[in-house]
Regions:
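Membrane-embedded segments
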Residues: 45-144
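Catalytic metal-binding/acid-base residues of hydrolase active sites
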Residues: 58, 90, 124-125, 148-149, ...
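Binuclear metal-dependent hydrolase catalytic cores centered on His/Asp/Glu-rich metal-binding motifs
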Residues: 134, 138-141, 147-148, 153-194, ...
Length: 283
């Protein structure tokens, strides 16, 4: 009987320590994940371009201003060419006051990018959509609401960047975001931002794009070694890990900065991604 009690006590201790770790350690220690991306579509003008991708801040839920300040500093140390944010700036359950709005505008405006900064809405943002849009605009982000932008290189190279609004709230309009590509074949490298990664197949089935960047899944906020993600949200059931190659398209999914639903992360620290985009050498 004593052995059984000992086992129970040990199990309880392990559970308590795991919960404490997931709450306080797992949600800390920001990581930068670096990926080289190769494509023969990359124009010479943009060979080696650096793109920072961060997502799912879920402000005011297990994330402090000090952590956001650190993220901004880390991004600026890299000196990115392009910065993209793929949604869920503010957690839907958070209460936001004017001081929070001023802080986010001021702090996110400090992120520097050589060419431009872009953002799309996530499903959590629709509870405060006007506030989030206002923050994006005042912080110097181009808000891509089923729209696109083109970055021009010095020698006629073109990068197309499109943003599709949240699929979860049925705000997506793929035609408005991407129809330009069907009539304009002179675009070199094509990037799409969409919060929910499962929508990637819809895009790829209709349009030829090179790179899709998403968030939403947090790569499975709670992960177990050899098992993987224990839970992923709707619209991130098929695609939720860090990377997928679908036909000729690269899909990268950020694990995010904040937390959603539960204030825990296990074997999955907060992170943002750095992509170095290279022109693939063909023989």
């Amino acid at each position: 009987m004593r052995k059984i009690y000992k086992v129970i006590i040990y199990v309880m201790i392990i559970i308590i320590l795991t919960v404490l770790y997931a709450r306080f350690i797992g949600t800390s220690f920001l990581k930068v994940k670096e990926y080289p991306v190769y494509s023969d579509s990359v124009p010479n003008d943009f060979d080696g371009i650096k793109i920072i991708h961060f997502s799912d801040l879920h402000y005011k839920r297990a994330i402090t201003r000090e952590k956001i300040d650190k993220i901004v500093d880390e991004i600026n140390l890299i000196k990115p060419d392009i910065v993209v944010f793929t949604g869920d700036l503010i957690d839907k359950d958070s209460i936001i006051v004017e001081d929070d709005i001023k802080y986010l505008k001021s702090t996110l405006s400090k992120i520097n990018a050589k060419y431009a900064k872009y953002a799309v809405m996530g499903n959590h943002d629709y509870n405060k959509i006007e506030t989030v849009e206002n923050i994006y605009n005042d912080a110097g982000f181009n808000y891509l609401n089923n729209s696109y932008d083109i970055i021009y290189g010095k020698n006629s190279g073109k990068i197309f960047i499109s943003g599709i609004s949240s699929v979860s709230y049925k705000q997506d309009d793929m035609t408005s975001a991407l129809e330009y590509l069907k009539d304009n074949k002179d675009i070199d490298y094509k990037i799409v931002l969409v919060h929910e990664p499962d929508f990637a197949e819809n895009i790829i089935n209709e349009y030829s794009v090179d790179l899709i960047l998403s968030g939403h899944s947090h790569n499975g906020q709670i992960r177990i070694p050899l098992v993987g993600a224990l839970y992923t949200p709707e619209n991130a059931k098929k695609y939720y890990d860090e990377y997928y190659s679908i036909n000729n398209t690269d899909l990268y999914i950020s694990s995010g900065i904040g937390v959603s639903k539960y204030n825990y992360r296990l074997f999955n620290h907060p992170s943002f991604n750095l992509y170095r985009i290279y022109k693939e050498k063909t023989s």
